[in-house]
Design a protein with these regions (language model features):
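N-terminal intrinsically disordered, low-complexity segments enriched in P/E/S/T
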Residues: 1-108
C-alpha cells in the first residue's frame, strides 16, 4: 500500500505538522470493503469512538498516520496511529473527529 505524506494544521498543537501514513480509503480498497458497507468505526485505546460514513471515507484524503514530522508517534504523543485530515477537508474542521491512539477499526 502506498505511503502518503500530508502537511496540515494540527488543531491541538496549533501548528503545521507533516504526517505520514496510508489513506483510509486505500485501506478500505485493499480490504475489499463492499459497496453495501455504510460505517467505519474507529476506537481509541481509551474507548473513545468515532464513526465515519464509508462514502465520506472513500471520497476524502483522510490519513491513518503513523509518523509525525518524520518520527513514529508514541502513545503519549497521540500514537501509534491517528486520523488526520488535509486542510481542505470539511471533516477536519471538527476536532472531535481527530481520533488518536487508534486501537481498532470495524466496518459495517
Amino acid at each position: 500500500m502506498r505511503r502518503v505524506r500530508l502537511e496540515t494544521a494540527e488543531p491541538f498543537l496549533k501548528r503545521r505538522v507533516t504526517f505520514e501514513g496510508v489513506l483510509l480509503s486505500d485501506l478500505l480498497a485493499v480490504a475489499d470493503v463492499p459497496d453495501t458497507a455504510s460505517t467505519v468505526s474507529l476506537t481509541a485505546l481509551d474507548d473513545y469512538k468515532v464513526d465515519f460514513k464509508v462514502a465520506d471515507v472513500r471520497s476524502s484524503q483522510m490519513l491513518l498516520a503513523t509518523k509525525a514530522d518524520g518520527k513514529h508517534m508514541p502513545v503519549d504523543r497521540s500514537g501509534p496511529i491517528r486520523i488526520v485530515f488535509p486542510d481542505s477537508s470539511s471533516m477536519g474542521r471538527n476536532p472531535d473527529l481527530w481520533i488518536w491512539s487508534v486501537a481498532s477499526m470495524q466496518v459495517a
